[in-house]
Amino acid sequence: VGFKAGVKDYKLTYYTPEYETKHTDILAAFRVTPQPGVPPEEAGAAVAAESSTGTWTTVWTDGLTNLDRYKGRCYHIEPVAGEESQFIAYVAYPLDLFEEGSVTNMLTSIVGNVFGFKALRSLRLEDLRIPVAYAKTFQGPPHGIQVEGDKLNKYGRPLLGCTIKPKLGLSAKNYGRAVYECLRGGLDFTKDDENVNSQPFMRWRDRFVFCAEAIYKAQAETGEIKGHYLNATAGTCEEMMKRAVFARELGVPIIMHDYLTGGFTANTSLAHYCRDNGLLLHIHRAMHAVIDRQKNHGMHFRVLAKALRMSGGDHIHAGTVVGKLEGERDITLGFVDLLRDDYIEKDRSPGIYFSQDWVSLAGVLPVASGGIHVWHMPALTEIFGDDSVLQFGGGTLGHPWGNAPGAVANRVALEACVQARNEGRDLAREGNEIIREASKWSPELAAACEVWKEIKFEFPAMDTL
């Protein structure tokens, strides 16, 4: 076959509607908005080509490989209801295109280059199907839901957390004091804010030492296991590992990482260290909204959540449905299931485009955090269930009597909701009543109820189905 130079349509090679997907293929669903005049088949094929083996012109070296074996294929196109110029393109990638155990390589291939493509007005990766063969090359979460419950000896209820505020400006000693008060009052965890790393007003080593002291003091006084998410995120991987090692030497149960700003390579290294050394790993998703908030361009958070489960983390922030940050109920529940369950059935109503089998990859606890307070407790308990972490920053530290009473109020509200649920009451309908009853015998809860009775964050969600 002679080499024929020149430019040819992508769809001739990369649009293959008759293709039967293999169980080893990585499948992707893209929401494509082409430029005017670009037909859907060509746009879908262009996405498949540019994110796999293709380039803009025929190249001589194509003859040296078996393209049929390695090319991505656009195998199905479906219209988007209510959007004229938009459609979902399904692309299948052969497994051999990806390095084993590397989320970094997977994302570089699938979303690395194609989003700047001129023939498209916008492009959004809605979902990925990770084949079992690829999932098995990842360690996944350091410990997972089951082991975490056993390590903490806490069962049958959501865990309670609190982000220490003001997030920047406290000295290490005062920071540790706030940690102690919250844990002593009844919380399971406190948390470094995502941007607390090692700043001039509080260097990381001082913070780690004072927080460890707070943890041990609170444990001794309450007889419960306590933790503080020590943020190990740093400017270099070496510095990050140094912080993780120091945390292990202090004997604390859990550390934390900002996985998107820190990067997947750093995150996976840290997750491996955590498993090898018995540390739990809390993951914060700082920067996610830059990537996932626009409906037409970027990546849906469910893809970032899947990537995190592969890279490794025991907790991850997943929206609240009821607080101050973005998160529609169905969509949020869609990726909460995706984080916790072994097998998720394809279901388009919460936006699940593919069935996903995680085989034996451990589950991740979803964390609800952001603008939530005691009045939200019944809804949160009902929406997230026992395998979750509910995090109240201002909702603890904003209590009129101080941090410890704020923690007491949250713990009482939670225990009341769990008890009511276990007695068969309907949390969605009777939620306010349950909180009111509990506040009769808890002055701390009564004071919290009074402060936050009118607070709501109500704006329409940006990302709808």
From Swiss-Prot:
Cofactor annotation comment: Binds 1 Mg(2+) ion per subunit.
Modified residues (N6,N6,N6-trimethyllysine): 4
UniProt binding sites for substrate: 113, 163, 167, 285, 317, 369
Listed GO biological process terms: photorespiration; reductive pentose-phosphate cycle
One Gene Ontology CC term in the entry: chloroplast
SUPFAM superfamilies assigned: RuBisCo, C-terminal domain, RuBisCO, large subunit, small (N-terminal) domain
Keywords: Calvin cycle, Carbon dioxide fixation, Chloroplast, Disulfide bond, Lyase, Magnesium, Metal-binding, Methylation, Monooxygenase, Oxidoreductase, Photorespiration, Photosynthesis, Plastid
Pfam families: RuBisCO_large, RuBisCO_large_N
Cofactor names: Mg(2+)
MF annotations from Gene Ontology: magnesium ion binding; monooxygenase activity; ribulose-bisphosphate carboxylase activity
Record PTM text: The disulfide bond which can form in the large chain dimeric partners within the hexadecamer appears to be associated with oxidative stress and protein turnover.
EC number: 4.1.1.39
Binding site for Mg(2+): 191, 193-194
PTM-bearing positions, type N6-carboxylysine: 191
Main location: plastid
Active site: 165 (proton acceptor), 284 (proton acceptor)
Location in or out of the cell: Plastid, Chloroplast
Reaction(s) this enzyme catalyzes, per UniProt: 2 (2R)-3-phosphoglycerate + 2 H(+) = D-ribulose 1,5-bisphosphate + CO2 + H2O; D-ribulose 1,5-bisphosphate + O2 = 2-phosphoglycolate + (2R)-3-phosphoglycerate + 2 H(+)
Classification via InterPro entries: RuBisCO, RuBisCo_large_chain_AS, RuBisCO_lsu_C, RuBisCO_lsu_C_sf, RuBisCO_lsu_fd_N, RuBisCO_lsu_N_sf, RuBisCO_lsuI
Annotated site residue numbers, Transition state stabilizer: 324
Other notes: The basic functional RuBisCO is composed of a large chain homodimer in a 'head-to-tail' conformation. In form I RuBisCO this homodimer is arranged in a barrel-like tetramer with the small subunits forming a tetrameric 'cap' on each end of the 'barrel'.
Reported function: RuBisCO catalyzes two reactions: the carboxylation of D-ribulose 1,5-bisphosphate, the primary event in carbon dioxide fixation, as well as the oxidative fragmentation of the pentose substrate in the photorespiration process. Both reactions occur simultaneously and in competition at the same active site.
Subunit structure, as described in the record: Heterohexadecamer of 8 large chains and 8 small chains; disulfide-linked. The disulfide link is formed within the large subunit homodimers.
Family from the record: Belongs to the RuBisCO large chain family. Type I subfamily.
Protein name in UniProt: Ribulose bisphosphate carboxylase large chain
